[in-house]
Amino acid sequence: VRAAGTGREARDFFSAAVYFQSPLQFGRAEAEHYVWFAERGYRVGIGLMLSSGGTGPATLAGALSLQLAELLCIHMLQRAVWGERRLDLYCSLTPLDMRRGMYPYGRPERPLAAVAMAQMARRYRASFAGHAGHADAKRPSCEAGAQKVLTALPLLMACGSAHISAGLLSVDEVFSPIQMILDEEATAALQRFARGFEITEETLAFDTTAQVGPGGCFTDTDHTLRHFRGEHWQPGLGSRDMRRAWQDAGSRTDVDLARERYRDVMSRPNTTTVLSSGQVSDRPETLDRKVSKGCESTGFEETCRSGERR
C-alpha cells in the first residue's frame, strides 16, 4: 500500500529476517529463503537467538564468543552479497531455563551479556544494538515491570539508549494494553534518568540557599517555582500519597489505575479515519498505531494474543 501510494519500489519498504541455527549453522530452508529474495533484489536480515546452555556454552564468556563468531560470519555473507561494509553487532543472548526448557527474556544474564557485547563493539568500532525491555510475566505485574527495567537499564547506562517493548508479555506471546500504559510510565522514568541534570550557577542555587538560611524551607521560593517541573519527574500512575491517604482514595494499585485509564480511552468515540496515500507516506507510524487500536477494540480488556493482532 505504501509503495503504491508513493510511487516507490516495494523493496524500499520490505523488511524480513531469517535466523541462524546456532551453533554455527545457516539452515537449508533459511538459506534458500535468503537466496530467493536476494535474486529478486530484496535484502533479508539474518538474526541470532542463541541460548546459553542450549545452543551455546553455559558460560557467558563461551556463549558470547560463539555469538561474536556467528555475527562476523553473517557480516561476511552480507558483504559478499550486498557489499555491506559496516560492521553491526547486536546481542540477544539469554540463558536456557534448565528446569523448564524456556527461552526467557527477563533474566539478569541477558543485559549482562548485552553490555559485554557493547564493549566488544566499541573495541571493534562497530555499531551495536541490544535486545532489552521484555518480560516473561504473563500478566501486568511487578514481575513484568521489574524484568523490563532490569533488561533495559544496563543498556541505557552502557550505550546511552535502550527500548521497552510496550505492552508485550510472555516473551512476545501476549499483548496487553494495560501493560502498555504501565510501560509508558516506566519509559518516562527511564528517560528522566537518562537526561541527567545540569550544573550551573543557577542550578547550584547558592543565592537561594543563602536566602532560605538554616532550618528554612525551599518550597515557596522562586527558584523552586522555576525549576521543579523540569527537574522532577511527575508520575502518572505511581504512588504520590502516604498509606493513609492512599487507603482513603480506594487503595488502588498501578495496575488498577492503568485499567481505569484504558477503559476511559476505549469509552471515547472512535475517531479513526481512512488515510489517503499521501497521508500514509507522510505518517507511516499511523499504520502501527491502527494495528494496536485493532487489538484493543477486540473486547479483551486484559490481554490480546500477538498472533491475533497480526
Residue ranges of predicted features:
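Hydrophobic alpha-helical bundle architecture
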Residues: 114-219
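Flexible, glycine/charged-enriched surface loops at secondary-structure junctions
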Residues: 8-11, 47, 82-90, 125-131, ...
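Flexible, active-site-adjacent loop/turn segments at secondary-structure boundaries
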Residues: 56, 62, 172-173, 180, ...
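Catalytic-core signal marking the mid-to-C-terminal active-site face
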Residues: 178-310
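Helix-rich catalytic cores of soluble enzyme domains
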Residues: 1-161
